[in-house]
Amino acid sequence: MQTRVVLDTNCLLASLSSKSENFRVWKDFQEGKYTLCVSNEILEEYQEIIAEKATPNIAQNVVRAIVESDYVEFIDSHFHLYAIFADPDDNKFVDCAFAANAAFIVSEDSHFDALKTLAFPKVLVLKLKAFLKYLENRD
């Protein structure tokens, strides 16, 4: 069974360019080296932020590639954990990770540090560099 992962939007964005040191994150997803877990809310944020930071066309292509991938798991979380108070918008990633029983969330966002202090839900958060090291060690 593949490792289930939730990617924060900025980590996904940082991995899209083939010239990026983080490109392996996107490439390994496309090659099925892990399963990307997403919800409709997460896909909407991917679309919005990538369109804003890159172009609407790139955003559409990225979201289409995710939706059509064999290595994506669509999660419909019927509950909200409200684990992050500093930025409630980040809770969609926590809810998705918890519902998917994901190994971790990949994020550079310090708001996710709040998860370290919670007894429940237990959701591991990796920084992008740590996730890259994880991918390298799996080879």
Predicted regions: what they are:
Residues Q2-R4:
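Extreme N-terminal starter segment of soluble prokaryotic enzymes
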Residues D28, I66, C96, T117:
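Hydrophobic/aromatic ligand-binding patch that stacks against planar heteroaromatic rings
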Residues N40-V67, Y134-D139:
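Extended, non-globular alpha-helical segments
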